[in-house]
C-alpha cells in the first residue's frame, strides 16, 4: 500500500467471504459494493475504521532524537512538535529517525477537481522541481472519516498507556498445512521415481524508511524507537532469516538500505538478489531474491510503467520479472516465471492501475512463453493496492474484465463512494502503448497470424473489455478459517485491509484451483501450505503495525508450492 499525502478518507476492504455474518466489525460503517459479484451482502461484511483523535493508536509520539536537544514549536491543527528549521533534519535522516526534509502536498481531498489525481509523494512538478514542504505529521484538516470506530478503538487512554508502558506480545501466526489435499504420490516413469520439487515463496512490503518519515501521521500509535531504522532493520532481517523462503518478493525496498545492508546480509545467507528502483528519482523499488542452491537465474526483466508522451502512464511504479530454473539433478523441471510489483496507490485512478497491470501481464506473457505457445508456471506477487473481489482482483483471477460504464474509482475497491463521475474510457490505454486489449505486446504475434487478427484487434479496441491469457489463482482465501473475519495484510493508523497477494498458476487438482483455469501438473503449481494471516483482534493485542516485533505496516505472505517433473520425451 502506498503511504502518501492522499490517504483514503474511506479506505476499506469492501470484500468478504460469501455467507459470513459480521461479528465484531473492524470498520466503522458499511461499504457499498463495486457493482460486481459477489453479492451485496458479501461486500457489506467489510468495514473501514478511521477516526482521527479516537483511535487507540493515533496519539502522536514525541519525535526526539536521542542525541539532539533543541526547542520545539507546536504546529497548527495540533500537529506533533518538530524542529523549527526543516533544513536541520538532514542529520536525523542519516540515523533513520523520523523528521525528513522531503515534503508532502496536502490531501487530495482539498484539491479543486475530483477528476484530477492526487499529487505523488515528493513527486516532481511539471517543471521538474521537487517539493520542499515539511513532512506530513497529521492528515489534512479537511479530510473526511467514517462515522464510527469499533469500541476497542474508542478507548484511547487506557489502551495507549498500557501499550506504551509494557512490552507488546508477539503476533501469533500459525502454518496452514494443505499438503493432505494434494496428490503427493511421486510419478513413476520407465522404472524411475520422479519426486516433485517443493519450494517456498514470500511476498513482503517492508516499508521504506523514507516513506515512513514522509508520512508520520500514519504511525501515531507507535513509540518512536519502533520506527527507527536502526531497530527496524535487524527485525526485518531476522524475520526474513527465520522464514527462510526460497523465493522472496519485496516491495518498498529503499535503494541505499538495499545496497548497504539488505543485499549484503541476504547474500551472506546464500541468496541472489535482483532489484529495480522506481523511476523519477524515487528512493525505493522492488526486489526479487532467491536461494542460489535452489534456483539459477535464466533472465531478469525490469518493467517501468512510466512512458514519456503517454499521459496515462506518467507514474513511477515498477515491476520486476525473473525467470528461474529449479536446481535438481535428478529430474527435468520447468522454469518458473516470478513477477513482483507495487501498483499505484491512488484509489481514484483505477485506469492507471489497470494499464500498469496490463504492461506487467504483457511482459509476463512474453517471458513465460514456451516454444509450444504454452506458458511455464507463473508466480505474481506484490502490493496491488486493491482489495479482494474488486474489479482489478477479479480481472487477475477471471482473465477478463467487462468495464462498460465502470467508475474509475471503483476499480480497486479502496473507497466506499468514488468522488467524481468519471468512468473508464474505451479503450483504457491508447494503442500507442503497444499493448493489446489481450494484455500482450502487439508485435508478439507472428507475421503469418497478424493479418488474420488485424480486424479482430481493431474491433477489440472499441469493446469495453480486456483479457489476459494467464491462469492465476490467489494463494490466500482472504477470510479467517475459524471466524470468517477478513484477513489483514496491511495496518496502520488509518486502515486495515488486504492489498498484498501471491497469485500462481494452479495445477489441475490444486486445492485453490478453478477447474476451468487449471494447468497440467508439470506446467502448474500445487499449494502445499501457507502462513495464516490475522484479523482485528490479533492486531489489537500487539498495538497494530508496526510494533516492536513487526517492523513494517504490512505482514509477510508465505506459501509453499509443489512443481511436478516434466514427462520424459
Curated annotation (Swiss-Prot):
Compositional bias of kind Polar residues: 63-72
Annotated Low complexity bias: 139-150
GO MF annotation list: catalytic activity; mRNA 3'-UTR binding
Any one of the GO BP annotations: 3'-UTR-mediated mRNA stabilization
Gene3D superfamilies, per the entry: Endonuclease/exonuclease/phosphatase
Pfam families (UniProt xref): Exo_endo_phos (PF03372)
Annotated segments matching region Disordered: 1-22, 63-92, 109-155
Database matches in InterPro entries: CCR4/nocturin_mRNA_transcr (IPR050410), Endo/exonu/phosph_ase_sf (IPR036691), Endo/exonuclease/phosphatase (IPR005135)
Superkingdom classification of source: Eukaryota
Similarity comment text for this entry: Belongs to the CCR4/nocturin family.
PANTHER family in the cross-refs: CARBON CATABOLITE REPRESSOR PROTEIN 4 (PTHR12121), PROTEIN ANGEL HOMOLOG 2 (PTHR12121:SF27)
Identification of the protein by name: Protein angel homolog 2
This protein's encoding gene: angel2
Amino acid at each position: 500500500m502506498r503511504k502518501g499525502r492522499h490517504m483514503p478518507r474511506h479506505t476499506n476492504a469492501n470484500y468478504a467471504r460469501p455467507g459470513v455474518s459480521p461479528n465484531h466489525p473492524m470498520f466503522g460503517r458499511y461499504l457499498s459494493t463495486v457493482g460486481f459479484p459477489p453479492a451485496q451482502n458479501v461486500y457489506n461484511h467489510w468495514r473501514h475504521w478511521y477516526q482521527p483523535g479516537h483511535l487507540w493508536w493515533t496519539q502522536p509520539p514525541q519525535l526526539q532524537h536521542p542525541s539532539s536537544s533543541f526547542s520545539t514549536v507546536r504546529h497548527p491543527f495540533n500537529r506533533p512538535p518538530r524542529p523549527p528549521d526543516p533544513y536541520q533534519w538532514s542529520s536525523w535522516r542519516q540515523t533513520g529517525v523520523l523528521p525528513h526534509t522531503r515534503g508532502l502536498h496536502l490531501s487530495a481531498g482539498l484539491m479543486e477537481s475530483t477528476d484530477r489525481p492526487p499529487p505523488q509523494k515528493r513527486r516532481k512538478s511539471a517543471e521538474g522541481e521537487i517539493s520542499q514542504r515539511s513532512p506530513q505529521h497529521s492528515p489534512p484538516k479537511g479530510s473526511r472519516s467514517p462515522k464510527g470506530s469499533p469500541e476497542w478503538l474508542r478507548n484511547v487512554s487506557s489502551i495507549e498507556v498500557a501499550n506504551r508502558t509494557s512490552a507488546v506480545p508477539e503476533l501469533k501466526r500459525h502454518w496452514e498445512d494443505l499438503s493432505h489435499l494434494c496428490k503427493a504420490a511421486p510419478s513413476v516413469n520407465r522404472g524411475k521415481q520422479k519426486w516433485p520439487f517443493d519450494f517456498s515463496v514470500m511476498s513482503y512490503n517492508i516499508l521504506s524508511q523514507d516513506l515512513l518519515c514522509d508520512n508520520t501521521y500514519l504511525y501515531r500509535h507507535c513509540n518512536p524507537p519502533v520506527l527507527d531504522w536502526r531497530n527496524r532493520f535487524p527485525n526485518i532481517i531476522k524475520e526474513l532469516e527465520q522464514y527462510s523462503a526460497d523465493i522472496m518478493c519485496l516491495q518498498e525496498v529503499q535503494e541505499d538500505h538495499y545496497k548497504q545492508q539488505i543485499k549484503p546480509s541476504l547474500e551472506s545467507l546464500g541468496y541472489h538478489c535482483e532489484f529495480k528502483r522506481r523511476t523519477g528519482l524515487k528512493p525505493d523499488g522492488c526486489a526479487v531474491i532467491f536461494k542460489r542452491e535452489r534456483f539459477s537465474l535464466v533472465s531478469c526483466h525490469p518493467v517501468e510503467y512510466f512512458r514519456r508522451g503517454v499521459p496515462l502512464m506518467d507514474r513511477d511504479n515498477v515491476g520486476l520479472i525473473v525467470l528461474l530454473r529449479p536446481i535438481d539433478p535428478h529430474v527435468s523441471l520447468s522454469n518458473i516465471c516470478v513477477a513482483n510489483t507495487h501498483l499505484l496507490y491512488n484509489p481514484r485512478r483505477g485506469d492507471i492501475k489497470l494499464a500498469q497491470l496490463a504492461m506487467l501481464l504483457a511482459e509476463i506473457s512474453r517471458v513465460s512463453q514456451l516454444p509450444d505457445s504454452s506458458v511455464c508456471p507463473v508466480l505474481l506477487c506484490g502490493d496491488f493496492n486493491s482489495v479482494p473481489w474488486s474489479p482489478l482482483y477479479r480481472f487477475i483471477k477471471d482473465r477478463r474484465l467487462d468495464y462498460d460504464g465502470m467508475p474509475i474509482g471503483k476499480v480497486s475497491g479502496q473507497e466506499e463512494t468514488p468522488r467524481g463521475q468519471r468512468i473508464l474510457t474505451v479503450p483504457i490505454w491508447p494503442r500507442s502503448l503497444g499493448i493489446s486489449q489481450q494484455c500482450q505486446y502487439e508485435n508478439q504475434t507472428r507475421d503469418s497470424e497478424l493479418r488474420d487478427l488485424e480486424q479482430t484487434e481493431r474491433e477489440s479496441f472499441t469493446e469495453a473489455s480486456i483479457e489476459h491469457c494467464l491462469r492465476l489463482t490467489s494463494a490466500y482465501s482472504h477470510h479467517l478459517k475459524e471466524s470468517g473475519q477478513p484477513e489483514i495484510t496491511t495496518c496502520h493508523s488509518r486502515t486495515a485491509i488486504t492489498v498484498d497477494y501471491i497469485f500462481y498458476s494452479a495445477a489441475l487438482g490444486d486445492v485453490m484451483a478453478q477447474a476451468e483455469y487449471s494447468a497440467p501438473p508439470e506446467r502448474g503449481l500445487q499449494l502445499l501450505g501457507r502462513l495464516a494471516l490475522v484479523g482485528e483482534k490479533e492486531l489489537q493485542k500487539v498495538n497494530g503495525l508496526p510494533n516492536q516485533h513487526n517492523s513494517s505496516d504490512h505482514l509477510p505472505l508465505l506459501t509453499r508450492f509443489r512443481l511436478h517433473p516434466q514427462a520424459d520425451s
